[in-house]
Amino acid sequence: MALELKIRELETTRLLLRPLELADAEQTQRIFPHWEIVKFLASVVPWPFPADGAFKHYRDRAIPAMERGDEWNWSICLKSDPGRLIGAIDLRRTHNSNRGFWLGLAWHGQGLMTEAAHAATAFWFDELGFPEMRVSKAIGNTASRRISQSNGMKLVAFEERDYVCGRLPTEVWAITADEWRSHCARSDGNSGRPTSRL
């Protein structure tokens, strides 16, 4: 597997996913700290979210993990407004939790995260070469569940996990590289398929 592969910009029909930078913390801090965004995130996210929370998270955890090759983090922007961050998505080698994301409230309900998740999943399989992706989500997180379903994933296990809102029953969804490629072939040109931005 080409785990040493550098992160690069991804493009979908409506989105640019650009590698996370420390400078993104300011925009993140403005749109991230809302209960509807954070409640189903892992309990390591502090709540109430501190005024320097995004900066410290990017400086102390996300960017070092990218430099080690343990994570691949992108800021999400609309092609129509490429300087404005609207969310983030990451890939990581953590057991049962290989992909995570959040999206600003103003952009919910438009299918944007489904598009971003498709692009990141393609990168996971086609460029990083992993054999399987697993994602965890609280049972009440129906929006995230729909994204896993639309990406062709299957429910494979149940467990309990700690979230910002407390300890909750959790679903584990998974898809193999072969299943992913079959899903993409059936989808016939899914709008989230990434294109190169070198």
Predicted regions and their residues:
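Soluble sensory domains of the PAS superfamily and closely related sensory modules
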Residues: 65-69
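Acyl-donor (CoA/ACP) binding surface of acyl/acetyltransferases
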Residues: 1-40, 73-198
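A generic secondary-structure signal
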Residues: 60-64, 123
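Conserved GNAT-fold acetyl-CoA-binding loop/helix
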Residues: 38-60, 72-74
